Amino acid sequence: MPSGDAGYGLDAIVDVSPLSEGQRTDLKRIVQRARSICGYGFGVYVGPLENGRDTAVAQHATLVDPASAVLVAVDPSKHAIEIVTGVNAFTTLDNRACELAALAMKSCFGADDLVGGIREGVNLLAEHARAPKVLHLDEN
């Protein structure tokens, strides 16, 4: 399994074996857009999760600034999804938000759309983590 920056955005991890070049490019854009939306680093891992969540947690630890990062790990052969948040990211991405993202991903995966499912999940997480705009009464 690859670890560290695999060239798919600032923090992404991707096991590229099941993915085409176009899909890898799409994942790079997805990760970059998510970072611009909420400021957290996002990583995507596609590949075997031999030890389930433990594998995902180990991959998350290799990200740049894991405390402020989110890893979406998908094992297509086992139909498994693991979402790991760092301690800072968890302040805005609780278990409920991660469950919602996982459900959206499963829906797309059921239609045989791996990259679309990852896109939906990462976008939901990024939008949920976005800081709300604060308006004050004295602002125009």
Identify the meaning behind each predicted range:
Residues 1-69, 77-140:
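A structural boundary signal for the start of the first folded domain, especially the loop/turn
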